Each structure stands twice: as C-alpha cells, then as structure tokens.
From Swiss-Prot:
Function (record text): Cell wall formation. Catalyzes epimerization of the terminal L-glutamate in UDP-N-acetyl-alpha-D-muramoyl-L-alanyl-L-glutamate.
Entry keyword S-adenosyl-L-methionine: no
Organism: Micromonospora sp. (strain ATCC 39149 / NRRL 15099 / SCC 1413)
Family: Belongs to the MurL family.
EC number: 5.1.1.23
One record GO biological process: regulation of cell shape
Protein name: UDP-N-acetyl-alpha-D-muramoyl-L-alanyl-L-glutamate epimerase
Keyword terms, alphabetized: Cell cycle, Cell division, Cell shape, Cell wall biogenesis/degradation, Isomerase, Peptidoglycan synthesis
Record-linked InterPro entries: MurL
Pathway: Cell wall biogenesis; peptidoglycan biosynthesis
Cellular compartments per GO CC: cytoplasm
Amino acid sequence: MPNEQLRRMDAFTFPSYSIDLATGEALFDYALTGPDGEQRFTEVITLPLPAEPPSDATVATLGRVLELLHVVAGVSYYKAAAPRRLVLPAPLGEAAAALVTAVYTKGLAEYAYRNQLPHVLELTPEIPAGSVPPAREYDNSDLRPLSAVGGGKDSIVSLEALRRAGLDPVPFSVNPNHVIVAVNEASGLAPLAARRRIDPVLFDLNAAGARNGHIPVTAINSLIAVATAVLNRLGPVVMSNERSASDPNLVWNGHEINHQWSKGVEAEGLLRAALAEHAGLTEPYFSLLRSLSELHIARLFAQIDRYDDVVTSCNAAFKLRDASERWCRDCPKCRFVFLAMAPFMPRERVVHIFGGDLLADETQIPGYRELLGVDGHKPFECVGEVEESVVALSLLAEQDQWRDAPVVRALVDAVPETAWSAAATSDVFTPGGPHHIPPPYAKALAQ
C-alpha cells in the first residue's frame, strides 16, 4: 500500500482474535481503514502449553487476559499510520480503558515526538457502550512466580533473589535469543518461552517508508507473560524494572516523553488494575526491583558471578551476527552499565564481562557526557538517572584502579560542582519510591 494511502487512513480497528488451546496459538486481527479501503494485519502469539489441559476457570481467565492483549498489542500496527480514531472492539471497564488510553498516548509519546504527531498524545479511544460482565476472581498469589528474563543484570538479580528466598521461579521470555538461552542455561532452571510473530506486512510497509518508531513493548510482553502464567497455572509475573524507568527524557507540548514508559511504575499500576478488573487476577504482575536504583542493582549483581560469561544489557548485541559478541561497547546502554558495574568489581572482571574497557576509550567521552547531564538530554535508551551516573563516577574517582583511566579523568573535569554536591547527598542506595511488591516478595531482596 502506498504511503499516501496510509496517511489517509482515519481509523484503527480490532476485527477479531482467537486461540487454539491445542497448540497455544493465538491470532490477533487488526485493520487500518480509510477512504481508499483497508489494510489488514494478523499477529500470531504462541503460548507454551501446560502438561495438563486447562480447567474451564483457567480458560475463562485466559480469555479475559487475551482481550487486553489484543488491544494493547495493536499499538505496533496503529503506528504505521497513526489515524485519529482508535475504535475498540468491545466495552471496557474504567481501569482497562485507562490502561489502553495510556498505552496509545504515553506509550507512544517518543514515537509522537520523533514523528511530530502531537495528536497521538491526545488520542481518546472510542469504546462501545455496554456493561462488562464482572470477572471471576482468580487467585494465583501462592503459585510459583514467572520471572521475566531479558539477559541483563536486572532480571538476573531478580531471578537469583527469588531462588534464594525459596520461591522456585520459572524463567520466562518472549522470542528468546541466544543471550537469553545462555542465561537460562546458566541459571539451571527450566524456562518457559512464548513466540510473538509480527505480521510481515508491517515490515514491508516500514521498508516502504511507513511511519515507524518506539512502542511500549514491555506492556505487550507483560501481558504475554500474564497469559502464559494463567495458562500454565503459575503465580505472579515478576518483572525487573527499576525506579529510574519512571524518569522522563524530556517534556514536549506539555507531555512527558519517556522512552521507558511501559517499564515505569505508572504503567505497572495501570496494568495491575486492568488485570484485576478485567481478568479477576488477585496478584497479576509487579516489578521486584521497583524501589531500587540502577546503581543499587549493579551492586547486587556484583555479588553474583555465575553469569559473567553470558550476561548482556546491550540491545545492539542482540542484532550482531557473532553470537560471542555480547556487548557492542559503543551505545548508551553499554556505557551506562559499564559505569554502574565498575565501582563494585575488580577492573579485570568488568573488562572481562564487556570484552573491552570503555573507560580507557576516549571516543566514549561524548556519550558519557550525555549520561552525566553535561550535554544534551538523557538518551532515548533504558539507562539510569543522571544522578546515578554522577554517583558512579564519584566512586570511580576515589578508587586507585579507576581514577587515572582517561575517560574518568575527562569526566571528572567536565561535571559541574552542583552535580557533585547533589551526588554527595544522593539516596541512590536507599530503596524508595512507589512500588507494588507484595509483602512475601519484598523479603526476597532482603535475603
């Protein structure tokens, strides 16, 4: 479909969804419609199957979760044209409607900013009138947790905390790559995985110049995880999103633009409320690390060494052809994670993990200046707060093994006195801020 036809699309709809419980394959249909006709899409999500057939109660609850997933996953296709009308397929309660509205506005805020589409930030879904049958309560709070694994330090810290606390976690991922497979193998735990197949038509449209950009993928993967947990009679989905995920990158047209919005505490609260209201789940989903800073998590990771040869937090590495290359060593994530780990490890260990020494590489100085708030705004990446970077630098400047590293010397001279003053009184190692961690799980981090 030519781009000019896409630009004339005036509505996005959700024709149908279905699931085959014999295979775990769910089909989600979407349509962009306009004066020139429609563009249809079908997404395929395959859930891992349980050993025993699910009960009627499980199937009913799963159906309610999939109704939310159908609407939320549509964000991938909506963005190809960003029409002004978002027409939902069925009535929703207040909490579910709030989630959907936020996913398509706040979740697409970076996309709207980069594509200069302010109307996306004001989008109001059209929800059919009618009542929603009340959900039957589904108590999963005492079942084994499904712990999302992304291959990075955060999910490893959560997985090991749950294991130490005797909570017997099940590792989970969507479309696991070689990094995640290696982390699962290092854990020694039996994982579950779901498969998500985006309609290839979308890639064809993107290649032809359709609108594209960042989506709230964590919201989609979180609902896939909840669906997997319900189908497999598992307990809460445990994520590893930290408190800096709630920190916006910038403000545009009066709206906060946050690359990590769907990892933030607001999105977590909206998703929990929607799942409780629409699916009856008593304890659906939370982030175990929500009250911790990235720097605090890095300190906890330093106490675990079984994953040194497999861990990566680098998004670019997932795209590298050489499976042995786990870090690109030239992106905001690599810079930040190296900076966060370095104060808590021998230099040889962190250099071994990364396959190189970023603080000896002077070409990294401009990127580090952004992380430290000296130049530009916080990068559109999943990185910690500026204050955390300054605190990490202050710790390195006090250590014999790091203080003379070329990048450390250059950055110490670049950081303004006001930032040093803030770092001196920082609370980055004090847990705090809003969270949704249930009391039995809060103890896991204190083990």
